[in-house]
Regions:
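Membrane-interface interhelical connector segments
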Residues: 42-58
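Extended, low-polarity transmembrane helix blocks
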Residues: 1-42, 60-68, 72, 78-146
């Protein structure tokens, strides 16, 4: 029993690093979302046309909304500013991307399925619930200066 208590105490020491997983999620999502938004700028007409074929009204406007949401949200998530607020429109984009684009292809990402949209949604939901984390997030420093 003493061994289990000692192991528990050792594992409890990892609480000092509780900020790290949230920071790593933010870094990863920045990379994915930033380049998704930037690539849509480079292929604006192609993406807008694709949205039009899906029946999305005003595809040019929605293309800009997606670009701003992905690139702007990625930048805010990277620096840890308004992380919870940024997660909400990004979750909406992920929902519609998953439903309109990926759902009919099933789960596997190899078939352009919903797998990555679901994983990114879970990561964004984590940020929505827990925020950007301690120390490496501007939200933390802004809220601690009250």
């Amino acid at each position: 029993m003493k061994i289990l208590i000692r192991l528990h105490d050792i594992l409890k020491g990892f609480e000092a690093f509780e900020f790290l997983p949230l920071f790593l999620i933010r870094l990863y999502l920045f990379y994915v979302l930033w380049f998704a938004g930037i690539n849509k700028i480079e292929s604006f007409n192609k993406f807008s046309g694709y949205l039009g074929t899906l029946g999305v009204p005003f595809p040019d406007i929605f293309t800009w909304l997606v670009i701003i949401t992905e690139a702007g949200g990625a930048a805010l998530i990277l620096i840890g500013l308004f992380v919870r607020w940024s997660s909400i429109p990004l979750l909406v984009v992920m929902f519609f991307a998953g439903y309109l684009v990926h759902w009919q292809n099933g789960w596997p990402h190899e078939a352009n399925g919903i797998e990555f949209a679901a994983i990114y949604s879970l990561m964004l939901l984590t940020l929505l619930c827990f925020g950007g984390g301690k120390y490496l997030s501007l939200d933390y420093w802004v809220s601690s200066n009250k």
